[in-house]
Amino acid sequence: MENDQFMCPTDIITGIVFIDGELAMLTLTADGELRWTEYGLRQYLSMKKDVLGFIVEGKQIRVKAVVEKEAGGICCGQFGGDFVRKDFVFEPLIDQNGWCYKLRQYLDSLGRPKRLLVFVNPFGGKKSAREIFVKEVKPLFEDADVQLEIQETKYQLHAKEFVKSMDVSKYDGIVCVSGDGILVEVVNGLLERADWRNALKLPIGMVPAGTGNGMIKSLLDTVGLRCCANSATISIIRGHKRSVDVATIAQGNTKFFSVLMLAWGLIADIDIESEKFRWMGSARIDFYALQRIICLRRYNGRILFLPAPGFEGYGQPASCSLYQEPHVSDKEVGYQGPETKFEDLEWREMKGPFVTIWLHNVPWGSENTLTAPAAKFSDGYLDLIVLKNCPKLVLLSLMRQTSSGTHVESPYIVYIKVKAFVLEPGALVDEPDKEGIIDSDGEVLARGKRTYKCDQKALMSYDKLQVTVDQGLATLFSPEY
């Protein structure tokens, strides 16, 4: 039989196989494609993009793959939207072991994770994480032959406590089936380890199963994928990685490590006070935002910032002295924040009253909120959004525009990039005996006088705090970009 049209000197393996009871020539090419002809049509599967794994069933080899839901066919080199699982079965006439060896060798060369620690948060959002994991996530990992250690979180900070003491050598990565909260716990736990430098090499993956899902939305949206569990899981299986900036929020000796955002004023009030409507799911945000805009609060205070190049004209010149902790060995106490000296640089300031202050590390704050459209994962800067005053009807329109990111084009919005930031929060303009809430990554960072009381304990006092950023400090599983 003439095989020239299928073979070239760089092919890894080629041979005659049965596919659906018909003889065909199957080739694994050097660039990682399985190619064959079926019913007169040339077909292919990309080992990198389509194939999850394979199993042997008697004389047959069953290749586990994912295909684009809209495509309807086996050819699926380019993805967009949801994926569906699809098997490709063939039976080699000879050398089944050779096929298995070459397939395994190629998959192993891709550097995909083989052992993952998985946190499932059964309490987040609509409490659907367990079901999402069992029905959508676990089957994909099984197809890819990934070994899982599953930990259901039982209380707040459970994930943080676990990663602080775990043996990092046991895993190739960590997966959070939750909203953004478990991701933040994991990052803080890794950074508080004595071996934080080594621990941070462990990539973290997210599967959306909570209320916010801002980080995974930002990652998937970058390459045009929908924010859904199977897209996120497949991105983890493929094993591509990218670095992400980590912000250190400090008040005296107290520190919190943020990968998403810090908010004060309107946005923090909506995020935290809407917890009483958690049963509504993500709709609680829109519902409570309307209430808060109707009864709009304005806060006294001051912000100072170190602008990125090109943003030096915003605000007024100011001097700023950041708190510097006495030098101690980070081998004993964990990560202490970036070591950059900021005091002699050209700081700027803005004074209140403010409606809201929003500091963002990635583009999306949630699945429906494109807070900072110009934000980058590892540029070493945070995106600062300032709203000082705004008519209520205009503000309602701006809140709707956050779904597309066009709110930052408003003349009422100041949108800049900063390297460091200081917040000096004050009381409400109309109620001087009432203060506000400072929110970071969806958690209460500080709570002032006469504010909404919730189950979350504040880490810091309602006072001056500083934010610095360390470029590309943490590692995330990511779609290929």
Swiss-Prot record:
PROSITE patterns: DAGK
Domain DAGKc: 111-253
Major location category of this protein: membrane
Membrane topology reported for the UniProt record: Peripheral membrane protein
Compartments it resides in: Vacuole membrane
SUPFAM superfamilies documented for this protein: NAD kinase/diacylglycerol kinase-like (SSF111331)
Knockout-associated phenotype: No visible phenotype under normal growth conditions.
Catalytic function, reaction form: a sphingoid base + ATP = a sphingoid 1-phosphate + ADP + H(+)
Ranges annotated as spanning the membrane: none
Protein's name according to its UniProt entry: Sphingosine kinase 2
Native species: Arabidopsis thaliana
